[in-house]
Amino acid sequence: MEKVKGAMTALITPFRNGKLDEEAYARLIQRQIDNAIDAVVPVGTTGESATLSHAEHKRCIEIAVEVCKGTSTKVMAGAGSNATHEAIDLAQFAQKAGADAILSVSPYYNKPTQEGLYQHYKALAESVDIPVLLYNVPGRTGVDIKPETVCRLFDDVNNIYGIKEATGSIERCVELLAKRPELYVISGDDAINYPIIANGGMGVISVTANLLPDKISMLVHAGLAGQFDTAKMINDELFDINKALFCESNPIPIKAAMYIAGLIDTLEYRLPLLEPSKEHMQLIEKTLAKYEVV
């Protein structure tokens, strides 16, 4: 089982006239490949998966697999739901489509117990043969996958190999690695990409990489090679843009930034998401000018 790691990008999903813009999506993925990104992650939080139909969700995975075919860039497909049977359907589709791994967010809104989370992930992972990465983002889902549950899943289920940690807590990442040194901990918070890698993390799933894939690739590859001074320097350099890209709920700012930078032709969201406020749009524009991406 090849464990997907390194510099990974949580892809945005571009729309045109209310529909998936397939050409723009393929173009964005190719840009990631061209900038040495190790894996693209379609239809996660940043990809507005919550407002996509299942047909659109699956089409995004297909496009990612098609564009990445024959390259060194892997596809880690989003396959999360608060209904286990839906998550299994998405995961099985991703495997059949040719995805290299699954990223599955914890069930949201219905707030399962830790035993419920265990049974959910066990059923999902056992329904496929490809690697599965847990995804913990309690600020969005309303439920925290506790370290004990993560360790239990890692011990009991062969293809669960790690977790995307988006709690923003370095302490949590250190705890997980102290308890299970072989667990792959992946940063889910761009602000602390370097600290997580320096403490034994195996990569990042980055929002900022949509805009600056070269910088994120350099940061991660330097860190994984033990070149911590270089990794820290890049992480520090990206502080202001990381902050600006989270001035409102993700993916509102990153999508606006991609539009301002000319990387997508239309700025469209699906309700209940809207364009950034005028104040935040100005902040994003000012920050992009500083980083010379406009």
Swiss-Prot record:
Domain of life: Bacteria
Enzyme class: lyase
Positions of pyruvate binding: T46, I205
GO molecular function: 4-hydroxy-tetrahydrodipicolinate synthase activity
SMART domains (UniProt xref): DHDPS
Reactions catalysed according to its record: L-aspartate 4-semialdehyde + pyruvate = (2S,4S)-4-hydroxy-2,3,4,5-tetrahydrodipicolinate + H2O + H(+)
Protein name: 4-hydroxy-tetrahydrodipicolinate synthase
Gene responsible for this protein: dapA
Active site: Y135, K164
Family: Belongs to the DapA family.
Keyword Amino-acid biosynthesis among record annotations: yes
NCBIfam families found in the cross-reference section: dapA
Record keyword Phosphoprotein present: no
Localization annotation: Cytoplasm
Residues at the site labelled Part of a proton relay during catalysis: T45, Y109
UniProt pathway annotation: Amino-acid biosynthesis; L-lysine biosynthesis via DAP pathway; (S)-tetrahydrodipicolinate from L-aspartate: step 3/4
Keywords: Amino-acid biosynthesis, Cytoplasm, Diaminopimelate biosynthesis, Lyase, Lysine biosynthesis, Schiff base
Task of the protein: Catalyzes the condensation of (S)-aspartate-beta-semialdehyde [(S)-ASA] and pyruvate to 4-hydroxy-tetrahydrodipicolinate (HTPA).
Quaternary structure note: Homotetramer; dimer of dimers.
PROSITE patterns found in the cross-reference section: DHDPS_1, DHDPS_2
Major location (coarse): cytoplasm
Enzyme nomenclature, EC number: 4.3.3.7
GO CC field: cytosol
One of the GO BP terms on file: diaminopimelate biosynthetic process
Species, as recorded: Nitratiruptor sp. (strain SB155-2)
